[in-house]
Amino acid sequence: MQDIYRHQDIESHVQRHWEQTQTFTVKEDPKKEKYYCLAMWPYPSGRLHMGHVRNYTITDVIARYQRMLGKNVLQPMGWDAFGLPAEGAAIKNKTSPIDWTKANIQYMKKQLQSLGFAYDWSRELTSCKPEYYRWEQWFFTQLYEKGLVYKKTSDVNWCPQDFTVLANEQVIDGRCWRCDSKVERKSIPQWFIKITAYADQLLDDLDELEHWPEQVKTMQRHWIGRSEGVEIRFPLDHDEKTDLTVYSTRPDTLMGVAFIAIAPDHFFSAEIAKNVPALATFIEECRHIKMAEAETATIEKKGIDTGFFALHPLTGKKIPIWVANFVLMEYGTGAVMGVPGHDQRDWEFATQYHLPIKAVILLEDGTEPDVQKKPLIEKGRLCHSGEFNGLSYQESCDRIIDKLVDLGTGQRKVNYRLRDWGVSRQRYWGAPIPMITLEDGRIIGTPEDQLPVILPEKTLIKDMINPLKADQDWAKTSVAGQLGIRETDTFDTFIESSWYYARYACPKYDQGMIEKAAANYWLPVDQYVGGIEHAIMHLLYFRFFHKLMRDQGLVDSKEPAKRLLCQGMVLADAFYYNAQNGERVWVSPTEVTVERDNKGQFLNAFDAQGRDLIHAGMSKMSKSKNNGIDPQAIVEKYGADTVRLFMMFASAPEMTLEWQESGLEGAYRFLKRLWRFVFDHVIQGPTQPLKKENLNSTQKNLRRNLHKTIAKVTDDIGRRQTFNTAIAAIMELMNQLYRAPTNTEQDRALIQEACISVIKMLYPFTPHISFILWQHLHQSPDETHPLNIDDSLWPVVDQNALIEDETLVVIQINGKMRAKITVPMNSTQQEVYESALQEPTVIKHLKGITPCHVIYVPNKLLNLVVNNE
């Protein structure tokens, strides 16, 4: 054994061993408890970033720990390989997306292997391979036959830069999630999957996901947006045979309606606009602004009075109809009743356009609110509401709805914010949608014997226009002798990531989408790890697809994953200087020299050219701020184990992690000191068996702390998933071991036990150094201690070692603490009293007076009551 830790010498050696022995390749074993641990698969962008490293390290720690519990652990890896960036890169580099993607996968796979992740590479998946996407094409045709897929022309979110449709979830603050371009509205034919048919299941089953973060479940509940209300029909004044239907969750405010607002794309808006040029212009302006429901609360409220009126369903009063930019056709009916006295948005609109504002709800104290100053949002008893005056919120809702139903002008209604999933993308680099339009106009799914519909992989892309649209030879096909035209749109790439976890159970199965026996063995995923930014896109589609596969008879479980961990972002210092044109030029932290005071506080920074830099603080690692850190360079400098240890120690997994190279250096020092400690122990030769019954008090205390640490680390990793506190506990134990005596054979035997346990506990975090140190600690392996730590089991707590022989008792005189003494556990009052009287501080404060009363709390406290008179 060499005396100095050199990560370069050991990590590649250990990784070769894992590759050659296929250590982490698994198969179904009904005799063993399974554990499926999965990180969200990456897009092969070409380089790993530190966010990837953190995600995959967390997952690997969990997987290795569960393996040491004796479970059959599956931890696969693959590539979410379709996507728009490949097209942009292909244009820039004058290559095909497939060649660019393959090269990226090859490089990133080497990066992952260099970090020592325990993947079963025999199950590797790549979503752009026909053998993968053929099954989602097949599944899509099955859903079409079941009526869960349909095509319609609809207004969609259109990215003018990427020339493609965006799902609602992919529009953030009115801009494309990918390129930040301002999103427009456009009417084009689209394919949809009926996720709304599963809205109740998706909502209700969230309650069964006990081990998912509440934040994710709350976000999904809000996105699904189930609400109970009433649909109310307001007849048009000029044509009482025609109604405007409004959906409301606040029927108690019906008597306060001041206006009806309809969406710019409502059918009535379009009808009126034919004869009102100003309205037509307004509608056109609104068409180019995609807005999520959440944004309606913050935008400037704009509208146009149509000059038409609706009739109040209970009073017959005429109510003006407005077209407003804050009403969304996608939610409810595309028409809302404006109650400015009791809704903030309606109040802002009414105030701007000088519409009447009426209070119909009383304050809690029974007085009438001044709704001219601000709306009363809270619920309460009704006023100015005729026969409903004085009723409570629930009473008024029930009575008003009942009356509307009796009059035939309303009905109870459950509504959802969730909209069907538009899966068409006008891009080339995606899985072709397997639909065909025949000569007779019928649309059918591609027959199974013609699947997969293969993308022409070597296509060179000259611009962002989809080349499939122009490839007439590819689009032409025939079915049963009838000519047809293929669909030239491709799938939203969220399709591929919605079922990959199930395919990992049977990656080479060629008789169907899923081999049910294998899927039912491995599923559901026991631990899923990924960022919370996926809460309402991937994680919702992921759950939806699982239910679709269940109903297709492919899997038996209700949900895809039992437990979800959302790791925090990785932050790094960001520095910039202002260029002559006023633009900020961001400088990589690796090129910055920082000066700090003796307390470590930032003083100033400058780059290699001596320019003074402005410190923008810690921010998410990103290309835009040039503050990303290349994992490969860090691994080469410090080693994979150091990077892994730092990543897990620097922060709790769900919290943000602040990247500091000083933290890496600290982790590196710890591993070097650990190596040297084991070296010094090993070179002294083999140890004798530990005689637990003959340990002295010092040895007992050390062994007790060892097994307390095992108990804590076990709980921290397995239940609490606070990996940073687990590492802190191991480090604290090592500090005790560094100071421990090594004079006797029993001292060394105890050090041997401690080293073995520490190496086992560190193995999930730092597998390479643990692998080598384990071999040096076991010159003669046996069944209890196998040759390779990969085959060893997690250390078991010796409950007998935790038994305390001694305890610390507080000594008080007249309630004031005067001393602390160590006595044998369960000592009697007399024994503790006699020991206390020997303490110098007790003698000093008693001043020769004999206590008149003694109070004893066994193993904790002795209070001597003294009469000082």
Swiss-Prot record:
<dbReference type="GO" id="GO:0005524">
    <property type="term" value="F:ATP binding"/>
</dbReference>
<dbReference type="Pfam" id="PF09334">
    <property type="entry name" value="tRNA-synt_1g"/>
</dbReference>
<dbReference type="InterPro" id="IPR002302">
    <property type="entry name" value="Leu-tRNA-ligase"/>
</dbReference>
<dbReference type="Pfam" id="PF00133">
    <property type="entry name" value="tRNA-synt_1"/>
</dbReference>
<keyword id="KW-0648">Protein biosynthesis</keyword>
<dbReference type="GO" id="GO:0005829">
    <property type="term" value="C:cytosol"/>
</dbReference>
<feature type="binding site">
    <location>
        <position position="623"/>
    </location>
    <ligand>
        <name>ATP</name>
    </ligand>
</feature>
<dbReference type="InterPro" id="IPR009008">
    <property type="entry name" value="Val/Leu/Ile-tRNA-synth_edit"/>
</dbReference>
<keyword id="KW-0547">Nucleotide-binding</keyword>
<dbReference type="InterPro" id="IPR025709">
    <property type="entry name" value="Leu_tRNA-synth_edit"/>
</dbReference>
<feature type="short sequence motif" description="'HIGH' region">
    <location>
        <begin position="42"/>
        <end position="52"/>
    </location>
</feature>
<keyword id="KW-0436">Ligase</keyword>
<dbReference type="InterPro" id="IPR001412">
    <property type="entry name" value="aa-tRNA-synth_I_CS"/>
</dbReference>
<dbReference type="GO" id="GO:0004823">
    <property type="term" value="F:leucine-tRNA ligase activity"/>
</dbReference>
<dbReference type="InterPro" id="IPR015413">
    <property type="entry name" value="Methionyl/Leucyl_tRNA_Synth"/>
</dbReference>
<dbReference type="Pfam" id="PF13603">
    <property type="entry name" value="tRNA-synt_1_2"/>
</dbReference>
<dbReference type="InterPro" id="IPR014729">
    <property type="entry name" value="Rossmann-like_a/b/a_fold"/>
</dbReference>
<dbReference type="Pfam" id="PF08264">
    <property type="entry name" value="Anticodon_1"/>
</dbReference>
<dbReference type="InterPro" id="IPR002300">
    <property type="entry name" value="aa-tRNA-synth_Ia"/>
</dbReference>
<keyword id="KW-0067">ATP-binding</keyword>
<dbReference type="InterPro" id="IPR009080">
    <property type="entry name" value="tRNAsynth_Ia_anticodon-bd"/>
</dbReference>
<keyword id="KW-0963">Cytoplasm</keyword>
<comment type="similarity">
    <text>Belongs to the class-I aminoacyl-tRNA synthetase family.</text>
</comment>
<feature type="short sequence motif" description="'KMSKS' region">
    <location>
        <begin position="620"/>
        <end position="624"/>
    </location>
</feature>
<dbReference type="GO" id="GO:0002161">
    <property type="term" value="F:aminoacyl-tRNA deacylase activity"/>
</dbReference>
<protein>
    <recommendedName>
        <fullName>Leucine--tRNA ligase</fullName>
        <ecNumber>6.1.1.4</ecNumber>
    </recommendedName>
</protein>
<keyword id="KW-0030">Aminoacyl-tRNA synthetase</keyword>
<dbReference type="InterPro" id="IPR013155">
    <property type="entry name" value="M/V/L/I-tRNA-synth_anticd-bd"/>
</dbReference>
<dbReference type="GO" id="GO:0006429">
    <property type="term" value="P:leucyl-tRNA aminoacylation"/>
</dbReference>
